[in-house]
Amino acid sequence: LDFSEPGILGVYVDEQQVALREATLSQAGLKLGRELASSFSSLRPNDLIWNYVVNNYLKGQSPPAFDLLYWNADSTNLPGPMFVQYLRRLYLDNALAKNELESLDVRLDLKKINLPSYVLAAREDHIVPWKSAYASAHCIKTASRKPAGLRFVLAASGHIAGVINPAHKNKRSFWTAA
């Protein structure tokens, strides 16, 4: 919701990059899911690219069967016009957090969303930095802090593993806001 601090992903989202995407995708076309996946992998090249180059290509080893690898490879194509609007309005303009985004001529005001909210972030997330998720949690109004209001949980691990791995003693953990 709040893209004021995009983290390392910001290397791909600046005025020049967005203008290039607008020139090629704003009227039609697709942003290919495999291109997005490659972009996300390039943000953590040692873990998500070079590890496989060395082990698979150079050493001839087959990658182990690993559910996270399958999930990571399951990408989705995005409509070009939606993708460039997302980059421009949400990332560059941060319009949603500023209550400046409109849909069907209606201004979206996050403070009018008065529902219990559970916000999960992952400490090593390279796509959604946990500090951005924390800032996003405070863009919405909550009826009360407890018992139903806002619950922010910071999980150990990264973008995918931080979501699906359960907490485990001496291996994975999580923290909650008091």
What are these regions (language model features)?
Residues 92, 126, 139-142:
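Short, well-ordered loop/turn and helix-capping segments at boundaries between secondary-structure elements
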Residues 113, 119-121, 125:
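Short beta-strand/loop motif that positions the catalytic acidic residue
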Residues 87, 137-177:
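Catalytic histidine neighborhood in serine/cysteine hydrolases
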Residues 1-86:
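Alpha/beta-hydrolase-fold enzymes
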Residues 72-108, 115:
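Mobile cap/lid helix-loop segments that gate and shape the active-site cleft of serine hydrolases
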Residues 124-128, 159-160:
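Acidic catalytic loop of the alpha/beta-hydrolase fold
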Residues 115-116, 148:
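Short coil/turn segments at beta-strand junctions that form active-site/ligand-binding loops
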